[in-house]
From Swiss-Prot:
It catalyses: glycyl-tRNA(Ala) + H2O = tRNA(Ala) + glycine + H(+); a D-aminoacyl-tRNA + H2O = a tRNA + a D-alpha-amino acid + H(+). The gene is dtd. This is D-aminoacyl-tRNA deacylase. CDD domains: Dtyr_deacylase (cd00563). Keywords: Cytoplasm, Hydrolase, RNA-binding, tRNA-binding. A motif (Gly-cisPro motif, important for rejection of L-amino acids) lies at residues 137-138. It comes from Fusobacterium nucleatum subsp. nucleatum (strain ATCC 25586 / DSM 15643 / BCRC 10681 / CIP 101130 / JCM 8532 / KCTC 2640 / LMG 13131 / VPI 4355). One of its GO terms (molecular function) is D-tyrosyl-tRNA(Tyr) deacylase activity. A Gly-cisPro motif from one monomer fits into the active site of the other monomer to allow specific chiral rejection of L-amino acids. Coiled coil: none annotated. An aminoacyl-tRNA editing enzyme that deacylates mischarged D-aminoacyl-tRNAs. Also deacylates mischarged glycyl-tRNA(Ala), protecting cells against glycine mischarging by AlaRS. Acts via tRNA-based rather than protein-based catalysis; rejects L-amino acids rather than detecting D-amino acids in the active site. By recycling D-aminoacyl-tRNA to D-amino acids and free tRNA molecules, this enzyme counteracts the toxicity associated with the formation of D-aminoacyl-tRNA entities in vivo and helps enforce protein L-homochirality. Its EC number is 3.1.1.96. It is found in: Cytoplasm.
Length: 151
């Protein structure tokens, strides 16, 4: 799994002009899934996401997590995070998971995050979405589970 996590003042996602999800202070999580991913990666990445200390404490140090600040999360599926443009100028997406597996793990990610009582909104898997956000910082963190030793 590969994710781009952005600390936001607000974020919202819409499809065909209809708002599907909207949050204020929290994290916008762009989530890419590859064919090698499983529930192990989901659990590890949810744990990392909810505990990532990228919110400022009273001394303006990034020392607080999403849970600490009672922030919200907006989760957006994004297969293009597995785009490879090393050869040519048109990205290849062969490293992205097939839709059935990707959707299943995407929904499990959302379910797992909600199990920690984190208010979670989501986009529509596979849809052409419009995402609007106001970065806070900006703070943007990229995490790839292949770089972790997940057992």
């Amino acid at each position: 799994m590969r994710t781009v996590i952005q600390r936001v003042k607000y974020a919202k996602v819409s499809v065909d002009g209809k708002i599907l999800g909207e949050i204020n202070k929290g994290l916008l999580v762009l989530l890419g899934i590859t064919h090698e991913d499983s529930i192990k990666e989901v659990k590890w990445l949810v744990n990392k996401t909810k505990n990532l200390r990228i919110f400022e404490d009273e001394e303006e140090k990034m020392n607080l997590s999403l849970e600490d600040v009672k922030g919200k999360a907006l989760i957006i599926s994004q297969f293009t995070l597995y785009g490879n443009s090393i050869k040519g100028n048109r990205p290849s997406f062969i490293d992205a998971a097939k839709p059935d597996l990707a959707k299943d793990l995407y929904l499990k990610f959302i379910e797992e995050l909600k199990s920690f009582d984190i208010e979670t909104q989501e986009g529509e898997f596979g849809a052409d979405m419009k995402v609007e956000l106001l970065n806070d910082g900006p703070v943007t963190i990229i995490i790839d589970t292949k770089d972790a030793n997940i057992k």
